[in-house]
Amino acid sequence: MAHFDLSCPIDERQVRALRVNDTVTLEGTLFGIRDATQIHMFDRGRKTRFDLAGHAVIHTAPNVRKVAPGPAHPSGYAPLCIGTTTSDRMERFTRPLMQQHGVRLIIGKGGLREDSAKSFSDLGGAYLAIIGGTAA
């Protein structure tokens, strides 16, 4: 078991050095992504505003509260916390997320299935497990 300090963007060589039970500390931007976001991206063809190449995404269910729209919160929502959500329901998006957007790491809880493991192996990515309930 080893520990890795990684800074985004991450390259394929860095990811392929990781082994099961290694620990990772990430530095840089982490993008939260949930099932609804990926449905918009892959089923409805919506483009992202961000370049995800070489970055990590976290399977998340953000918690927000409604506020008056303003400069700090133009959408009318303020973030409260970001909690992990179960990765299994996002299984079908792993390969397209890596192929089309260059994502290297997916962080989530509950794990992913064989199709995702094959995608990680084929495309140079990894799944990082996180403890559920860390947003509480």
Language model: regions and residue ranges:
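Short, structured beta-strand/loop micro-motifs enriched in basic residues and often containing a Trp
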Residues: 1-10
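Feature captures the catalytic cores and cofactor-binding loops of soluble hydro-lyases/lyases
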Residues: 32-136
